[in-house]
Amino acid sequence: MASGDPAIVASHLTKSFGTRRAVDDVSFQLPAGSFLSIFGPNGAGKTTLLRLLCTLARPSGGRACVAGIDLKERPDEARARIGLISHQSMLYPDLSAEENLLLYARLYGVADPQARVGELLQVVGLSHRRLDPVRTFSRGMTQRVSIARALVHDPQVVFLDEPYSGLDPHAVDIFDELIDAVRDERTFVMVSHDLAKGFQMCTHALVMARGRVVRFAPRDHLDYGDFAQLYRDTVGMGVA
């Protein structure tokens, strides 16, 4: 990805399940280094759009590029530049935090896995628990390991799928601090039902309803009160 290129380009992206279009003709460009929050009611297509952009699903139509790579033509190369943090743990519960991270580091071909894993465990504040099985961790601690796992191969774009689900307020604060600490020049894309939190975190906001983009704009161009009303209006639209 050349300097100044957008981190994500979606062009007429569509995903159908039978006769229903979960994502319907979605187009937008997101500058590199941005934090995009995607909002919308249940069934709006938020998670489906995220899955398309992080190569977990194939589009029915249209194209998308992430980190300068066409997802349709070079999906494996794109995955090497993408990280994912989900509300569903992608960790092996009986393995230690260190073992989980080493597994993913080797999977991605990280040059010095042990050093990289040690660095990330220090970043997320879990060096002292590195040898403990993940199943002994709290929900908040598990999410901290998930942050480290998503960053183990130093991705350019990180996707977050409802990352606050099940976290208590203290764990949410720690999660936010860690994300701020690793933002650097990375691009983040988050799906969230928490309007206030998502708006606070983002540089850009995208609202969906019935699979379509209702609004996409930099946060600086949005008034929170008007934006909250727009969100409430989309909730009233329901699903297709």
What name fits each language-model region?
Residues F39-P41:
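The feature captures the beta-strand-to-loop junction immediately N-terminal to the Walker
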Residues V158-D161:
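Catalytic Walker B motif of ABC-type/P-loop ATPase nucleotide-binding domains
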Residues L102, R106-R129:
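Conserved ABC ATPase "signature" region
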Residues C54:
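Helix-to-loop junction immediately C-terminal to a conserved catalytic motif
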Residues G198-Q200:
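A short, surface-exposed alpha-helical micro-motif characterized by mixed small hydrophobic
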Residues G62-D70, A78, R215-A217:
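Conserved ABC transporter NBD signature motif
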